[in-house]
């Protein structure tokens, strides 16, 4: 089934996968934002010596981290569906634009997995720090992971910006 325009076609499978992928991406952004807020709250609990609340929040964040990973995996499946439909998109300019957009989003998902893994490591280190402080070596690991998380966030934001520009170009082409 195709959505037809004069000299233009976009497979319904592509459009459906794009919509599902968009919803997943929004959920990932929301969950990741919540994790950043929790990190601030954990730091506050640390300053207040409230280890039980910090540990509780860290446990919740480790579960949220798994949820983000699962959502990113589902997003990659939607990107695969979109990629399979690309050869059937007309005109060629739209096909080329969306191929670039999908490639950018695949790169973004790859960075997202790395970002999420750094977060997981950070929460695990903080869990050790609060539950077994005698095993906690130093704050260098925390500082390193926060720096890596920030690097990945910058890369993800840049890829997202490029993706949005490219997908907007695709939309302009097919909606002319």
Identify the function of each model-found stretch.
Residues 3-79, 105-176:
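C-terminal amphipathic alpha-helix
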Residues 80-90:
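Extended alpha-helical coiled-coil "stalk/arm" regions
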